[in-house]
Protein backbone atom coordinates (compact mmCIF):
# COMPACT_ATOMS: atom_id res chain seq x y z
CA UNK A 1 0.00 0.00 0.00
CA UNK A 2 1.26 3.49 -0.85
CA UNK A 3 2.19 5.90 1.87
CA UNK A 4 -0.74 8.25 2.47
CA UNK A 5 1.54 11.29 2.18
CA UNK A 6 2.24 10.35 -1.45
CA UNK A 7 -1.39 9.55 -2.16
CA UNK A 8 -1.93 12.17 -4.82
CA UNK A 9 1.45 11.64 -6.47
CA UNK A 10 0.91 7.88 -6.67
CA UNK A 11 -2.28 8.32 -8.67
CA UNK A 12 -1.24 11.00 -11.14
CA UNK A 13 -1.99 9.94 -14.71
CA UNK A 14 1.05 9.20 -16.81
CA UNK A 15 -0.16 11.43 -19.62
CA UNK A 16 -0.10 15.15 -18.89
CA UNK A 17 -3.53 16.00 -20.21
CA UNK A 18 -3.14 19.72 -19.75
CA UNK A 19 -0.66 19.92 -22.63
CA UNK A 20 -1.92 18.28 -25.80
CA UNK A 21 0.72 16.58 -27.80
CA UNK A 22 3.07 15.89 -24.93
CA UNK A 23 3.61 12.92 -22.67
CA UNK A 24 5.63 12.52 -19.53
CA UNK A 25 8.76 11.88 -21.61
CA UNK A 26 8.16 14.78 -24.00
CA UNK A 27 7.26 12.69 -27.09
CA UNK A 28 4.97 13.88 -29.84
CA UNK A 29 1.18 13.92 -29.50
CA UNK A 30 -0.35 10.57 -28.73
CA UNK A 31 -3.95 9.57 -28.15
CA UNK A 32 -4.58 8.23 -24.67
CA UNK A 33 -6.95 5.27 -25.08
CA UNK A 34 -8.29 5.82 -21.54
CA UNK A 35 -9.11 9.48 -22.11
CA UNK A 36 -12.85 10.17 -22.29
CA UNK A 37 -14.19 13.20 -24.14
CA UNK A 38 -16.07 15.56 -21.79
CA UNK A 39 -19.85 15.16 -21.90
CA UNK A 40 -21.66 17.86 -19.96
CA UNK A 41 -25.33 18.08 -19.08
CA UNK A 42 -27.40 20.33 -21.32
CA UNK A 43 -31.01 21.28 -21.89
CA UNK A 44 -33.70 19.94 -19.59
CA UNK A 45 -31.33 17.69 -17.64
CA UNK A 46 -29.00 20.59 -16.83
CA UNK A 47 -31.98 22.69 -15.73
CA UNK A 48 -33.26 19.90 -13.46
CA UNK A 49 -29.85 19.33 -11.87
CA UNK A 50 -29.29 23.06 -11.31
CA UNK A 51 -32.81 23.46 -9.91
CA UNK A 52 -32.24 20.62 -7.44
CA UNK A 53 -28.87 21.79 -6.14
CA UNK A 54 -30.07 25.40 -5.97
CA UNK A 55 -33.04 24.31 -3.84
CA UNK A 56 -30.53 22.51 -1.61
CA UNK A 57 -28.67 25.81 -1.30
CA UNK A 58 -31.89 27.62 -0.40
CA UNK A 59 -32.62 25.05 2.30
CA UNK A 60 -29.15 25.42 3.86
CA UNK A 61 -28.81 29.20 3.54
CA UNK A 62 -32.24 29.86 5.07
CA UNK A 63 -30.99 28.14 8.24
CA UNK A 64 -28.04 30.54 8.50
CA UNK A 65 -30.31 33.54 8.99
CA UNK A 66 -33.49 31.94 10.31
CA UNK A 67 -32.02 31.51 13.79
CA UNK A 68 -31.94 35.29 14.35
CA UNK A 69 -35.72 35.50 14.81
CA UNK A 70 -36.06 32.01 16.33
CA UNK A 71 -33.82 32.91 19.28
CA UNK A 72 -36.51 34.79 21.29
CA UNK A 73 -38.78 31.73 21.15
CA UNK A 74 -35.94 29.38 22.13
CA UNK A 75 -34.85 31.55 25.07
CA UNK A 76 -38.45 31.94 26.26
CA UNK A 77 -38.81 28.15 26.44
CA UNK A 78 -35.42 27.14 27.85
CA UNK A 79 -34.45 30.31 29.80
CA UNK A 80 -30.77 30.06 28.82
CA UNK A 81 -29.66 33.54 27.76
CA UNK A 82 -26.02 32.53 28.12
CA UNK A 83 -26.46 30.04 25.25
CA UNK A 84 -27.80 32.59 22.76
CA UNK A 85 -24.48 33.12 20.98
CA UNK A 86 -24.01 29.40 20.40
CA UNK A 87 -27.26 28.98 18.45
CA UNK A 88 -25.68 30.82 15.53
CA UNK A 89 -21.96 30.23 16.01
CA UNK A 90 -22.25 26.42 16.33
CA UNK A 91 -23.31 26.24 12.68
CA UNK A 92 -20.47 28.45 11.45
CA UNK A 93 -17.82 26.65 13.53
CA UNK A 94 -18.68 23.17 12.24
CA UNK A 95 -19.15 24.42 8.68
CA UNK A 96 -15.73 26.09 8.69
CA UNK A 97 -13.90 23.12 10.20
CA UNK A 98 -15.63 20.50 8.03
CA UNK A 99 -15.45 22.23 4.61
CA UNK A 100 -11.96 20.94 3.67
CA UNK A 101 -12.97 17.43 4.80
CA UNK A 102 -15.89 17.50 2.40
CA UNK A 103 -13.52 18.67 -0.33
CA UNK A 104 -11.37 15.59 0.23
CA UNK A 105 -14.41 13.29 0.28
CA UNK A 106 -15.64 14.70 -3.04
CA UNK A 107 -12.18 13.97 -4.43
CA UNK A 108 -11.88 10.35 -3.33
CA UNK A 109 -15.50 9.16 -2.96
CA UNK A 110 -18.39 9.14 -5.43
CA UNK A 111 -19.63 12.73 -5.81
CA UNK A 112 -23.32 11.86 -5.99
CA UNK A 113 -23.38 9.78 -2.81
CA UNK A 114 -21.18 12.23 -0.95
CA UNK A 115 -23.57 15.06 -1.84
CA UNK A 116 -26.56 12.99 -0.74
CA UNK A 117 -24.78 12.24 2.55
CA UNK A 118 -24.32 15.97 3.18
CA UNK A 119 -28.04 16.63 2.60
CA UNK A 120 -28.94 13.72 4.89
CA UNK A 121 -26.65 14.97 7.70
CA UNK A 122 -28.17 18.44 7.40
CA UNK A 123 -31.67 16.96 7.76
CA UNK A 124 -30.57 14.92 10.80
CA UNK A 125 -29.34 18.14 12.40
CA UNK A 126 -32.70 19.75 11.64
CA UNK A 127 -34.53 16.91 13.41
CA UNK A 128 -32.25 17.15 16.47
CA UNK A 129 -32.80 20.92 16.73
CA UNK A 130 -36.55 20.71 16.10
CA UNK A 131 -37.13 17.99 18.72
CA UNK A 132 -34.64 19.44 21.22
CA UNK A 133 -35.70 18.92 24.87
CA UNK A 134 -33.18 21.51 26.10
CA UNK A 135 -30.88 24.30 24.97
CA UNK A 136 -27.82 22.06 24.59
CA UNK A 137 -29.72 19.84 22.15
CA UNK A 138 -30.53 22.89 20.00
CA UNK A 139 -26.81 23.73 19.88
CA UNK A 140 -25.92 20.14 18.95
CA UNK A 141 -28.56 20.15 16.22
CA UNK A 142 -27.26 23.45 14.85
CA UNK A 143 -23.71 22.05 14.85
CA UNK A 144 -24.82 18.96 12.89
CA UNK A 145 -26.63 21.28 10.48
CA UNK A 146 -23.38 23.19 9.96
CA UNK A 147 -21.53 19.93 9.29
CA UNK A 148 -24.02 18.98 6.58
CA UNK A 149 -24.39 22.54 5.26
CA UNK A 150 -20.69 22.83 4.43
CA UNK A 151 -20.94 19.65 2.36
CA UNK A 152 -24.03 20.91 0.54
CA UNK A 153 -22.51 24.32 -0.27
CA UNK A 154 -19.16 22.92 -1.38
CA UNK A 155 -20.84 20.03 -3.18
CA UNK A 156 -23.13 22.37 -5.11
CA UNK A 157 -20.15 24.31 -6.46
CA UNK A 158 -18.32 21.08 -7.33
CA UNK A 159 -21.39 19.73 -9.14
CA UNK A 160 -21.61 22.97 -11.15
CA UNK A 161 -17.95 22.57 -12.11
CA UNK A 162 -18.32 18.91 -13.06
CA UNK A 163 -21.76 18.81 -14.70
CA UNK A 164 -22.26 22.16 -16.45
CA UNK A 165 -20.38 23.23 -19.61
CA UNK A 166 -17.33 25.28 -18.54
CA UNK A 167 -18.46 28.39 -20.44
CA UNK A 168 -21.50 28.55 -18.13
CA UNK A 169 -19.58 28.31 -14.84
CA UNK A 170 -19.22 32.07 -14.10
CA UNK A 171 -22.91 32.76 -14.73
CA UNK A 172 -24.07 29.71 -12.75
CA UNK A 173 -21.80 30.50 -9.79
CA UNK A 174 -23.03 34.11 -9.86
CA UNK A 175 -26.63 32.91 -9.89
CA UNK A 176 -25.86 30.46 -7.08
CA UNK A 177 -24.40 33.28 -4.98
CA UNK A 178 -27.52 35.40 -5.59
CA UNK A 179 -29.73 32.48 -4.49
CA UNK A 180 -27.56 31.92 -1.41
CA UNK A 181 -27.67 35.56 -0.33
CA UNK A 182 -31.38 36.11 -0.95
CA UNK A 183 -32.22 32.97 1.05
CA UNK A 184 -29.89 33.91 3.91
CA UNK A 185 -31.42 37.35 4.33
CA UNK A 186 -35.00 36.11 3.94
CA UNK A 187 -34.31 33.55 6.68
CA UNK A 188 -35.06 35.92 9.58
CA UNK A 189 -38.35 36.99 7.95
CA UNK A 190 -39.48 33.38 7.55
CA UNK A 191 -38.19 32.49 11.02
CA UNK A 192 -40.12 35.38 12.52
CA UNK A 193 -43.30 34.14 10.87
CA UNK A 194 -42.86 30.60 12.22
CA UNK A 195 -41.83 31.76 15.71
CA UNK A 196 -44.75 34.16 16.14
CA UNK A 197 -47.35 32.17 14.19
CA UNK A 198 -46.64 28.54 15.09
CA UNK A 199 -43.48 27.65 17.01
CA UNK A 200 -39.73 28.21 16.71
CA UNK A 201 -39.42 24.45 16.21
CA UNK A 202 -40.96 24.80 12.74
CA UNK A 203 -37.88 26.78 11.69
CA UNK A 204 -36.24 23.33 11.66
CA UNK A 205 -39.14 20.95 10.96
CA UNK A 206 -39.83 22.74 7.66
CA UNK A 207 -36.57 21.34 6.24
CA UNK A 208 -37.91 17.77 6.18
CA UNK A 209 -40.77 18.14 3.66
CA UNK A 210 -38.40 20.09 1.40
CA UNK A 211 -35.33 17.92 1.96
CA UNK A 212 -37.11 14.65 1.13
CA UNK A 213 -37.98 15.64 -2.47
CA UNK A 214 -34.45 17.03 -2.91
CA UNK A 215 -32.99 13.60 -2.15
CA UNK A 216 -35.39 11.97 -4.64
CA UNK A 217 -34.51 14.49 -7.38
CA UNK A 218 -30.79 14.01 -6.76
CA UNK A 219 -31.18 10.23 -7.06
CA UNK A 220 -33.09 10.63 -10.33
CA UNK A 221 -31.21 13.35 -12.17
CA UNK A 222 -27.71 13.86 -10.76
CA UNK A 223 -25.24 12.10 -13.06
CA UNK A 224 -21.54 12.92 -12.90
CA UNK A 225 -19.92 12.84 -16.39
CA UNK A 226 -17.72 9.83 -17.09
CA UNK A 227 -14.64 11.96 -17.75
CA UNK A 228 -14.72 13.03 -14.08
CA UNK A 229 -12.93 10.29 -12.20
CA UNK A 230 -12.40 10.03 -8.47
CA UNK A 231 -8.82 9.53 -7.36
CA UNK A 232 -8.39 5.78 -6.65
CA UNK A 233 -7.50 5.08 -3.03
CA UNK A 234 -8.11 2.54 -0.28
CA UNK A 235 -10.27 3.49 2.69
CA UNK A 236 -7.16 3.65 4.86
CA UNK A 237 -5.58 6.12 2.45
CA UNK A 238 -8.79 8.18 2.36
CA UNK A 239 -8.91 8.39 6.17
CA UNK A 240 -5.28 9.56 6.22
CA UNK A 241 -6.07 12.13 3.51
CA UNK A 242 -8.95 13.58 5.58
CA UNK A 243 -6.38 15.00 8.04
CA UNK A 244 -8.47 14.40 11.16
CA UNK A 245 -5.78 15.88 13.48
CA UNK A 246 -5.97 19.15 11.54
CA UNK A 247 -9.77 19.09 11.69
CA UNK A 248 -9.77 18.63 15.47
CA UNK A 249 -7.22 21.41 16.04
CA UNK A 250 -9.16 23.87 13.88
CA UNK A 251 -12.49 22.94 15.49
CA UNK A 252 -11.25 23.31 19.08
CA UNK A 253 -9.43 26.56 18.28
CA UNK A 254 -12.68 28.05 16.92
CA UNK A 255 -14.57 26.93 20.03
CA UNK A 256 -11.94 28.60 22.26
CA UNK A 257 -12.16 31.88 20.34
CA UNK A 258 -15.96 31.86 20.46
CA UNK A 259 -15.95 31.22 24.21
CA UNK A 260 -13.50 34.06 24.83
CA UNK A 261 -15.48 36.54 22.73
CA UNK A 262 -18.80 35.59 24.30
CA UNK A 263 -17.42 35.86 27.84
CA UNK A 264 -15.18 38.90 27.49
CA UNK A 265 -16.84 42.11 28.63
CA UNK A 266 -20.30 40.53 28.78
CA UNK A 267 -20.46 37.83 31.46
CA UNK A 268 -16.81 38.06 32.54
CA UNK A 269 -14.14 40.75 32.58
CA UNK A 270 -11.52 40.68 29.83
CA UNK A 271 -8.80 40.14 32.45
CA UNK A 272 -10.62 37.16 33.93
CA UNK A 273 -8.45 34.03 34.02
CA UNK A 274 -10.84 31.90 31.96
CA UNK A 275 -11.07 34.53 29.20
CA UNK A 276 -7.28 34.87 29.02
CA UNK A 277 -6.85 31.08 29.08
CA UNK A 278 -9.25 30.52 26.17
CA UNK A 279 -7.57 33.25 24.11
CA UNK A 280 -4.16 31.71 24.76
CA UNK A 281 -5.52 28.28 23.83
CA UNK A 282 -6.94 29.72 20.61
CA UNK A 283 -3.53 31.12 19.63
CA UNK A 284 -1.66 27.93 20.57
CA UNK A 285 -4.13 25.66 18.77
CA UNK A 286 -4.14 27.88 15.67
CA UNK A 287 -0.34 27.70 15.49
CA UNK A 288 -0.48 23.94 16.05
CA UNK A 289 -3.00 23.68 13.20
CA UNK A 290 -0.70 25.54 10.79
CA UNK A 291 2.30 23.43 11.81
CA UNK A 292 0.28 20.24 11.40
CA UNK A 293 -0.87 21.33 7.94
CA UNK A 294 2.72 21.98 6.91
CA UNK A 295 3.93 18.54 7.98
CA UNK A 296 0.89 16.74 6.58
CA UNK A 297 1.85 17.77 3.04
CA UNK A 298 -0.67 16.50 0.48
CA UNK A 299 -2.73 14.89 3.25
CA UNK A 300 -3.42 18.30 4.80
CA UNK A 301 -6.96 19.69 4.96
CA UNK A 302 -5.59 22.72 3.12
CA UNK A 303 -2.72 21.37 0.96
CA UNK A 304 0.05 23.94 0.73
CA UNK A 305 0.70 22.88 -2.87
CA UNK A 306 -2.67 24.46 -3.69
CA UNK A 307 -2.76 27.19 -1.06
CA UNK A 308 0.66 28.66 -1.87
CA UNK A 309 -0.32 29.42 -5.47
CA UNK A 310 -0.84 33.17 -5.79
CA UNK A 311 -4.10 32.67 -7.66
CA UNK A 312 -5.41 30.60 -4.73
CA UNK A 313 -4.16 32.45 -1.65
CA UNK A 314 -4.95 35.93 -2.99
CA UNK A 315 -8.51 34.94 -3.90
CA UNK A 316 -8.91 33.05 -0.61
CA UNK A 317 -7.93 36.16 1.36
CA UNK A 318 -10.22 38.33 -0.78
CA UNK A 319 -13.05 35.87 -0.12
CA UNK A 320 -12.40 35.83 3.64
CA UNK A 321 -12.32 39.63 3.97
CA UNK A 322 -15.15 40.48 1.56
CA UNK A 323 -17.40 38.02 3.39
CA UNK A 324 -16.43 39.69 6.67
CA UNK A 325 -17.76 43.00 5.31
CA UNK A 326 -20.87 41.28 3.97
CA UNK A 327 -21.80 39.27 7.07
CA UNK A 328 -21.78 42.33 9.34
CA UNK A 329 -24.24 44.15 7.07
CA UNK A 330 -26.39 41.03 6.71
CA UNK A 331 -26.80 40.64 10.46
CA UNK A 332 -26.65 44.23 11.71
CA UNK A 333 -28.63 46.15 9.09
CA UNK A 334 -31.85 44.39 10.23
CA UNK A 335 -30.83 45.12 13.85
CA UNK A 336 -30.46 48.78 12.86
CA UNK A 337 -33.96 48.81 11.36
CA UNK A 338 -35.54 47.04 14.32
CA UNK A 339 -33.76 48.79 17.20
CA UNK A 340 -33.30 52.32 15.87
CA UNK A 341 -36.40 52.68 13.69
CA UNK A 342 -38.66 50.37 15.72
CA UNK A 343 -39.54 48.14 12.78
CA UNK A 344 -40.82 44.58 13.06
CA UNK A 345 -38.77 41.63 11.81
CA UNK A 346 -40.99 41.45 8.72
CA UNK A 347 -40.72 45.20 7.98
CA UNK A 348 -36.95 45.13 8.44
CA UNK A 349 -36.84 42.19 6.03
CA UNK A 350 -38.80 44.22 3.47
CA UNK A 351 -36.34 47.09 3.88
CA UNK A 352 -33.44 44.79 2.98
CA UNK A 353 -35.06 43.85 -0.35
CA UNK A 354 -33.23 46.64 -2.27
CA UNK A 355 -29.94 45.21 -1.00
CA UNK A 356 -30.99 41.72 -2.10
CA UNK A 357 -32.19 42.86 -5.52
CA UNK A 358 -29.01 44.72 -6.37
CA UNK A 359 -26.81 41.99 -4.89
CA UNK A 360 -28.51 39.48 -7.19
CA UNK A 361 -28.20 41.89 -10.13
CA UNK A 362 -24.49 42.43 -9.49
CA UNK A 363 -23.80 38.70 -9.11
CA UNK A 364 -25.62 37.70 -12.30
CA UNK A 365 -24.22 40.59 -14.38
CA UNK A 366 -20.61 39.99 -13.31
CA UNK A 367 -21.01 36.24 -13.85
CA UNK A 368 -22.30 36.84 -17.38
CA UNK A 369 -19.60 39.38 -18.26
CA UNK A 370 -16.81 37.18 -16.89
CA UNK A 371 -18.21 34.29 -18.92
CA UNK A 372 -17.69 36.42 -22.04
CA UNK A 373 -14.43 38.23 -21.23
CA UNK A 374 -12.81 35.42 -19.16
CA UNK A 375 -11.14 38.02 -16.90
CA UNK A 376 -11.83 38.05 -13.14
CA UNK A 377 -9.45 40.48 -11.39
CA UNK A 378 -10.85 43.74 -12.86
CA UNK A 379 -14.32 42.89 -11.58
CA UNK A 380 -13.02 42.02 -8.12
CA UNK A 381 -11.41 45.47 -7.99
CA UNK A 382 -14.52 47.21 -9.36
CA UNK A 383 -16.84 45.38 -6.98
CA UNK A 384 -14.61 46.07 -3.97
CA UNK A 385 -14.49 49.81 -4.79
CA UNK A 386 -18.29 50.04 -5.09
CA UNK A 387 -18.70 47.91 -1.95
CA UNK A 388 -16.42 50.28 -0.01
CA UNK A 389 -18.34 53.34 -1.20
CA UNK A 390 -21.63 51.73 -0.17
CA UNK A 391 -20.20 50.69 3.19
CA UNK A 392 -19.07 54.27 3.84
CA UNK A 393 -22.66 55.44 3.31
CA UNK A 394 -23.97 52.71 5.63
CA UNK A 395 -21.47 53.76 8.29
CA UNK A 396 -22.82 57.34 8.42
CA UNK A 397 -26.40 56.17 9.07
CA UNK A 398 -27.74 57.51 12.37
CA UNK A 399 -30.85 57.45 14.54
CA UNK A 400 -32.62 60.02 12.36
CA UNK A 401 -31.47 58.90 8.90
CA UNK A 402 -34.33 59.02 6.35
CA UNK A 403 -35.47 56.02 4.33
CA UNK A 404 -33.97 57.33 1.08
CA UNK A 405 -30.54 57.46 2.71
CA UNK A 406 -30.41 53.90 4.01
CA UNK A 407 -31.97 52.43 0.87
CA UNK A 408 -29.44 54.24 -1.33
CA UNK A 409 -26.58 53.02 0.86
CA UNK A 410 -27.68 49.39 0.83
CA UNK A 411 -28.31 49.46 -2.93
CA UNK A 412 -24.75 50.64 -3.61
CA UNK A 413 -23.23 48.19 -1.15
CA UNK A 414 -25.34 45.30 -2.42
CA UNK A 415 -24.44 45.92 -6.06
CA UNK A 416 -20.72 46.16 -5.27
CA UNK A 417 -20.54 43.05 -3.12
CA UNK A 418 -22.70 41.18 -5.65
CA UNK A 419 -20.23 41.97 -8.42
CA UNK A 420 -17.16 40.65 -6.62
CA UNK A 421 -18.32 38.17 -4.00
CA UNK A 422 -18.56 35.00 -6.08
CA UNK A 423 -15.55 35.70 -8.33
CA UNK A 424 -12.89 34.10 -6.07
CA UNK A 425 -14.64 30.74 -6.36
CA UNK A 426 -14.87 31.08 -10.15
CA UNK A 427 -11.19 32.00 -10.42
CA UNK A 428 -9.83 29.30 -8.13
CA UNK A 429 -11.92 26.56 -9.75
CA UNK A 430 -11.05 27.80 -13.23
CA UNK A 431 -7.30 27.75 -12.65
CA UNK A 432 -7.17 24.47 -10.70
CA UNK A 433 -6.29 21.11 -12.18
CA UNK A 434 -9.33 18.86 -12.47
CA UNK A 435 -8.16 16.56 -9.67
CA UNK A 436 -7.64 19.59 -7.40
CA UNK A 437 -11.04 21.23 -7.98
CA UNK A 438 -12.71 19.56 -4.98
CA UNK A 439 -9.87 20.42 -2.58
CA UNK A 440 -9.69 24.00 -3.88
CA UNK A 441 -13.46 24.34 -3.52
CA UNK A 442 -13.24 23.05 0.06
CA UNK A 443 -10.62 25.71 0.85
CA UNK A 444 -12.81 28.49 -0.57
CA UNK A 445 -15.94 27.32 1.27
CA UNK A 446 -13.82 27.16 4.43
CA UNK A 447 -12.85 30.81 3.89
CA UNK A 448 -16.52 31.77 3.50
CA UNK A 449 -17.58 29.98 6.66
CA UNK A 450 -14.43 30.89 8.62
CA UNK A 451 -15.35 34.50 7.96
CA UNK A 452 -18.64 33.83 9.69
CA UNK A 453 -17.05 31.88 12.54
CA UNK A 454 -14.37 34.50 13.23
CA UNK A 455 -15.76 37.86 12.21
CA UNK A 456 -19.40 37.45 13.23
CA UNK A 457 -18.19 36.48 16.72
CA UNK A 458 -15.79 39.46 16.78
CA UNK A 459 -18.53 41.83 15.62
CA UNK A 460 -20.96 40.50 18.23
CA UNK A 461 -18.37 41.02 20.97
CA UNK A 462 -17.60 44.52 19.66
CA UNK A 463 -21.28 45.45 19.51
CA UNK A 464 -22.18 44.04 22.93
CA UNK A 465 -19.20 45.58 24.73
CA UNK A 466 -19.63 49.05 23.23
CA UNK A 467 -23.40 49.02 23.64
CA UNK A 468 -23.24 47.94 27.30
CA UNK A 469 -20.51 50.46 28.13
CA UNK A 470 -22.62 53.24 26.61
CA UNK A 471 -25.76 52.13 28.47
CA UNK A 472 -23.96 51.96 31.82
CA UNK A 473 -22.46 55.42 31.34
CA UNK A 474 -25.82 57.00 30.44
CA UNK A 475 -28.30 54.87 32.38
CA UNK A 476 -26.38 53.01 35.07
CA UNK A 477 -29.54 51.86 36.84
CA UNK A 478 -30.47 49.51 33.97
CA UNK A 479 -29.73 45.80 34.28
CA UNK A 480 -27.10 44.84 31.64
CA UNK A 481 -28.55 41.31 31.38
CA UNK A 482 -31.97 42.79 30.57
CA UNK A 483 -30.52 45.05 27.89
CA UNK A 484 -28.55 42.19 26.33
CA UNK A 485 -31.42 39.72 26.53
CA UNK A 486 -34.01 42.01 24.96
CA UNK A 487 -34.30 41.47 21.21
CA UNK A 488 -33.82 44.44 18.89
CA UNK A 489 -37.49 44.44 17.86
CA UNK A 490 -38.66 44.36 21.51
CA UNK A 491 -36.85 47.47 22.78
CA UNK A 492 -39.91 49.67 22.28
CA UNK A 493 -42.00 47.30 24.44
CA UNK A 494 -39.53 46.71 27.28
CA UNK A 495 -38.14 50.24 27.76
CA UNK A 496 -39.77 53.65 27.72
CA UNK A 497 -39.03 57.34 28.20
CA UNK A 498 -35.43 58.30 28.92
CA UNK A 499 -34.42 54.67 29.35
CA UNK A 500 -35.55 53.88 25.79
CA UNK A 501 -33.70 56.91 24.43
CA UNK A 502 -30.49 55.85 26.19
CA UNK A 503 -30.78 52.24 25.02
CA UNK A 504 -31.42 53.26 21.40
CA UNK A 505 -28.45 55.65 21.51
CA UNK A 506 -26.29 52.85 22.93
CA UNK A 507 -27.46 50.46 20.22
CA UNK A 508 -26.49 53.04 17.60
CA UNK A 509 -22.99 53.34 19.07
CA UNK A 510 -22.54 49.56 19.00
CA UNK A 511 -23.93 49.25 15.46
CA UNK A 512 -21.68 52.06 14.21
CA UNK A 513 -18.63 50.26 15.58
CA UNK A 514 -19.64 47.11 13.71
CA UNK A 515 -20.17 49.11 10.51
CA UNK A 516 -16.75 50.74 10.98
CA UNK A 517 -15.25 47.25 11.22
CA UNK A 518 -17.09 46.27 8.05
CA UNK A 519 -15.86 49.42 6.27
CA UNK A 520 -12.27 48.57 7.17
CA UNK A 521 -12.75 45.07 5.74
CA UNK A 522 -14.21 46.47 2.51
CA UNK A 523 -11.27 48.87 2.11
CA UNK A 524 -8.82 46.04 2.77
CA UNK A 525 -10.58 43.99 0.07
CA UNK A 526 -9.73 46.76 -2.42
CA UNK A 527 -6.03 46.37 -1.58
CA UNK A 528 -6.26 42.58 -1.82
CA UNK A 529 -7.84 42.81 -5.27
CA UNK A 530 -4.66 44.50 -6.52
CA UNK A 531 -2.63 41.42 -5.52
CA UNK A 532 -4.81 38.99 -7.48
CA UNK A 533 -3.15 37.96 -10.78
CA UNK A 534 -4.52 39.60 -13.92
CA UNK A 535 -5.11 36.50 -16.02
CA UNK A 536 -7.68 35.24 -18.44
CA UNK A 537 -9.61 32.16 -17.40
CA UNK A 538 -8.45 29.17 -19.48
CA UNK A 539 -10.12 28.85 -22.88
CA UNK A 540 -12.34 25.81 -22.85
CA UNK A 541 -11.98 25.17 -26.53
CA UNK A 542 -8.40 24.14 -25.78
CA UNK A 543 -6.80 22.00 -23.16
CA UNK A 544 -6.74 24.11 -20.04
CA UNK A 545 -3.49 24.85 -18.31
CA UNK A 546 -3.78 24.34 -14.59
CA UNK A 547 -2.46 26.91 -12.18
CA UNK A 548 0.55 24.84 -11.22
CA UNK A 549 1.80 24.70 -14.80
CA UNK A 550 1.08 28.38 -15.37
CA UNK A 551 3.16 29.14 -12.30
CA UNK A 552 5.99 27.06 -13.75
CA UNK A 553 5.67 28.90 -17.06
CA UNK A 554 5.83 32.27 -15.27
CA UNK A 555 8.99 31.19 -13.48
CA UNK A 556 10.53 29.98 -16.76
CA UNK A 557 9.65 33.23 -18.53
CA UNK A 558 11.10 35.29 -15.69
CA UNK A 559 14.34 33.29 -15.76
CA UNK A 560 14.53 33.69 -19.54
CA UNK A 561 14.06 37.43 -19.26
CA UNK A 562 16.81 37.73 -16.65
CA UNK A 563 19.11 35.61 -18.81
CA UNK A 564 18.40 37.80 -21.85
CA UNK A 565 19.11 40.97 -19.90
CA UNK A 566 22.43 39.57 -18.74
CA UNK A 567 23.47 38.71 -22.32
CA UNK A 568 22.54 42.23 -23.47
CA UNK A 569 24.59 43.82 -20.73
CA UNK A 570 27.53 41.55 -21.51
CA UNK A 571 27.48 42.46 -25.18
UniProtKB/Swiss-Prot annotation:
Biased composition (Basic and acidic residues): 8-17
Cellular location(s): Cell membrane
Gene Ontology MF annotations: transmembrane transporter activity
Extent of Polar residues compositional bias: 19-28
Membrane topology classification: Multi-pass membrane protein
Signal peptide segment: none
Entry keyword set: Cell membrane, Glycoprotein, Membrane, Transmembrane, Transmembrane helix, Transport
Glycan attachment points: 25
PROSITE patterns named among the record's database cross-references: MFS
One family name in Pfam for this protein: MFS_1
GO CC, alphabetical: plasma membrane
Region (Disordered): 1-34, 538-571
Domain of life: Eukaryota
Transmembrane parts of this sequence: 47-67, 86-106, 120-140, 143-163, 171-191, 202-222, 238-258, 275-295, 317-337, 350-370, 379-399, 405-425, 443-463, 514-534
CDD domains: MFS_Azr1_MDR_like
Purpose of the protein: Efflux pump that is probably involved in the export of dehydrocurvularin.
Sequence similarity: Belongs to the major facilitator superfamily. TCR/Tet family.
Name of the protein: Dehydrocurvularin exporter
Gene name for this UniProt entry: curE
Amino acid sequence: MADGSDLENNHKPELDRSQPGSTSNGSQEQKDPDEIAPEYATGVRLILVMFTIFVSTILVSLEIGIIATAIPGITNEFRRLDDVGWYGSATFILAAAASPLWGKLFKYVDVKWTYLSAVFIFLVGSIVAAAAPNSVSVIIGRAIQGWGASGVLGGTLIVINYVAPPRNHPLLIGTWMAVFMVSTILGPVIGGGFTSGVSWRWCFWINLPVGGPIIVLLLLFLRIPKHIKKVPATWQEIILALDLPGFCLLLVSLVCLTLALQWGGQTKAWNDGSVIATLVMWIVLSIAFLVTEWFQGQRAMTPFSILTLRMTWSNALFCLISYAALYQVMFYLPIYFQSIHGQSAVKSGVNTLPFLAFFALGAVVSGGVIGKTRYTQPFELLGALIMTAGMALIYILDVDSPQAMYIGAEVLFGFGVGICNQIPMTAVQGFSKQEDVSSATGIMVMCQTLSGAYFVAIAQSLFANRMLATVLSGAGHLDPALVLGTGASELQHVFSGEDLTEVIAAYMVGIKDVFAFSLACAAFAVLLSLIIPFKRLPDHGKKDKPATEEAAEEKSEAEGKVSGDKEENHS
